[in-house]
């Protein structure tokens, strides 16, 4: 064995490549070993350093891959064990054990997290060269007993199913020990680069290779100053020193110092020496030179998005200077926090990148499909799960519009559960759903699922056969091929499909002869899919590489950007959270001889120093270290390592917000520039200098010119929220000339509530989602129907009998039967409605001097100027003197307020008076009023009554009164009825004023509607809060930001309120 160390200013790779070349020139076969995470990049670096740029004598690979070169022909043809297969084996083992067999873990038998921890422990045991019987000294002896039972049973299953329990390194080591590879290894040289420690498995293999190979050469970075130190605790080279010292002591070799021809910039070397002096308690009498600072930058940004955008701009600048994407490396302090953001931002700046991390399959449509399938079976055809299966795009041949229509109907009819999905859809609504089409679609969905879900407990092989048959029926494979929109997506789908078929194969192999329920089968496949990962190789090498900063090696790229280096992530603190604690691992590690657990937490300090050292020397030209103030919406501090750099004299640059300028980094990329222009166009103006304003004025003028050529535009507005007028063509279609504009009292109220709401409801005809479950609208229809029947009954039957008959016949109507007899909740609603009817009906019995002229009367009121107002009057009453009035049933409390009417928010009663005047063309003297009747079951607080007497009954009837507008002329006739006339009496002239102003409201609204420009202007009564419909989900209206756009209502003092509003009405209606 040969041990080599060198300073950070030299290239260890060049030194080891020279050693490899010498061995290759002598006829030896050379394996150049790199860590798993660096083998691809190391191969490119090694081949670059070779004069011939390639050779068959030097193979750059990993330990595991090297073992396959030697054992590929002699290895037994057994099944391969991966994490998913291991999890299935442990699940099968736990199935065969009873809870009482496992005192410590019996309650966790079906826990997926516990099974994952078992898999991790089993892999750790293999890497540590330990068996489950070596787990002595645990905190609780029963833990070892349980683990022995579980793992031994799992290993028995592996033997039965012909799985290879040995890892590739174990198989390689066994072949070496048996002497099967002596001839090959005698002609082999092993070169090892990039390691600072070996696992127990690698350590054992290395001892065998050292005895059988021609030579083993290992290199590591250690400074000569550190190598000569006797006390190395806390030294930045502590990990490498321990690594070399252990090997030197074990193999009785003295490490040799070497140098390379390539010497990196002295700025990095001087920074390293300062860093080393800080941690070995020595002194230096110099500082970084001014020109050294040109190679380092410390950035501070407010949050991650700004940080990534600054990096993207800097990368674009490097390209402008002539460098290539492959010269740039981006390191992330927290992969999970940055992974979702960095992709879209780099795409915006048109920067191709490769993320050096396996992607989880959990977000792929195939995994979502399998998860929805499993949940559909487990939760008995829950609607959300069935729809998620369809929306994955992998079930059957359905268009998006078909799926939307199916979803709309199932929500309306509340279809959930197998019983409802299995029956034909028969319920319809006013929207007239295409039931024939929906039933055909229902059958295409239900039949294959029903065939699969009716599977009873049976052999796993039979379940897999039925599952595959189901997947063939729904054309899963064909649909999977149709998902991809690009070559990259094709490659991703191929990798996902391969993992899926591997999981099915493993399940068939392990559980083929075991009896299982379908739910267990689907749950196992789902778990395997959700935990699986895949990796896609970039289509070109000229990309920006992105990876975690703790995987970096010295001198990786010319330009390195390390971002997210906050105190929480730099340095990283790693802790085990498995079935064994670190204390238990330490006790087990007392057994040596190549057998030991890796305890990451015990090596945090020296590993973090080694990582920081590699990071500070990762670049060969320029290193940028960046830290956000806020990461994952949490404030974080500077890393202690960055604070050391600041003490060395490196300035911390506050990058601030991404204000646009005319620097190359801001305007050098068209796509990024356009996106920033749009972003600025949506926000408040920022302060600019005169020079900036002039520049951006010219740029905007040029951009608009280019956008016009592409038929695009940048919208401008004086308000944060604005709307565009409808085009002339649309106005002509929506409001054709010669055809009256149809309005109603409800439509007018909506218009004056918020014009944009009118546009959505009556121009676009958007409606809320319907439901078969009764709501306030259906409740109102029921009450109307009962009272309509009751008032039509002119027989001599007692009133109570009439009421019972009206309720009975209304309940027998098919529509109300479907609505109110669907479930217990609907039946309860019906019982409450019947109570309301019985409570309200006596008011009709008391007013015997009233004659009902008509009910549910349709009317069309001509307002002039091509405006036609339509509606339905619930009831027209006639007093004994022949005067007519209108009753409008309400399921909630309503009362006419002249101020609300003036502001256009309560035109219903006055509109009905105008309609009645047109229907019965008599003068105003023959109208006694228009009123609301609140259909209710009055609630009284009995605490306020001293005794149960007539006052209680009077209070009930007081709540059951007509409230609205009444003619002062009919005051005497109204006094004997249940009419609340206080502050509600109007003279004939005042009634005429109300009618005239009502017409003015319609004309004013119609004029605005026909212009086709609808404002977002919900009303406010006080200028502080908004009471109108804000439609936040659509308009993004915010009261604190958009109060200026709200319509302020006219309000007047309560004193003389009626007279003042009538004066305003006369004035405005005459204009």
Swiss-Prot record:
Alphabetic keyword roster: ATP-binding, DNA damage, DNA repair, DNA-binding, Exonuclease, Helicase, Hydrolase, Nuclease, Nucleotide-binding
Under Enzyme Commission nomenclature, its number is 3.1.-.-
- Needed cofactors: Mg(2+)
What biological-process terms (Gene Ontology) are attached? double-strand break repair via homologous recombination
The UniProt record lists the keyword DNA damage? yes
One Pfam family this sequence matches: PDDEXK_1
A single Gene Ontology MF term assigned here is: helicase activity
Q: May I ask which residue range the UniProt record assigns to the signal sequence?
A: none
Q: What else is known?
A: Despite having helicase-like domains, this subunit does not have helicase activity.
Describe its partners and assembly state: Heterodimer of AddA and RexB.
* Function field: The heterodimer acts as both an ATP-dependent DNA helicase and an ATP-dependent, dual-direction single-stranded exonuclease. Recognizes the chi site generating a DNA molecule suitable for the initiation of homologous recombination. This subunit has 5' -> 3' nuclease activity but not helicase activity.
Protein name, per record: ATP-dependent helicase/deoxyribonuclease subunit B
Organism of provenance: Streptococcus pyogenes serotype M12 (strain MGAS9429)
Taxonomic placement = Bacteria, Bacillati, Bacillota, Bacilli, Lactobacillales
